[in-house]
Amino acid sequence: NSNLGVLRTLANAGSGFDIVSGGELQRVIAAGANPSKCVFAGVGKTEKEIELALKKGIYAFTTESEPEMVRINKIARQLKKKAPIAIRVNPNVDAKTHAKITTGTYENKFGIVFEEIEGVYERAAKLKNLHLRGVQMHIGSQLTEAGPFEKAVRKVAPLAKRLAEKHGIEFFSLGGGVGITYESALESGDAKWWRSPNRRNLLTPAKYAAKLVPLLKPLGLRILIEP
């Protein structure tokens, strides 16, 4: 969100920020938020953006590939810093949403395939200017049911536990994707609709939490989500 007032309100409420550019980081700072609560995602980070993020002390980079991981390590070495990273795992879970906004199957370009991710962490651990801080996933956008989230977490949670035991990671980021039921929302002028069974079938934060918290709590990790 580019509105500084909105960003300031979120910052005052204790929110962190998921950013995908140096410009977004600058807006977060301009809004008075703490860069240490920013996670830098995205597949197109430039060298200057990585340098800026390291100098400002962001919480973590989400890395999408081994070449990007190596590149961040090189830039961090030049700055005599350690770059905190989380590697994005592709769990190969169908988000049951529109094909153009699905990001968690092997047909999509995002993340490291599940079967290879632990080997990537092993290699990352040997890069001296990286700090393995977490693991991340994001299976898609506009999800209107909890099932795909639950399936992905059931698959990735044991991985997160192993990574914590072996590499000391401290957080598991679930990404985002909770959808808005636009068609039904257009009917919201009718008060009767909000008391109908359709209203009760919406994916709410409470339903999301009820499905996922029991799976996540035993991990003892910090959990990040993008509402």
Where are the regions that the model predicts?
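N-terminal active-site wall of soluble small-molecule enzyme domains
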Residues: 1-58, 97
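Structural preference for beta-strand elements that scaffold enzyme active sites
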Residues: 16, 35-39, 60, 82-88, ...
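Acidic (Asp/Glu)-rich catalytic clusters
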Residues: 10-12, 29-35, 54-55, 73-82, ...
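C-terminal active-site-proximal or functional interface alpha/beta core segments in diverse enzymes
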Residues: 144-227
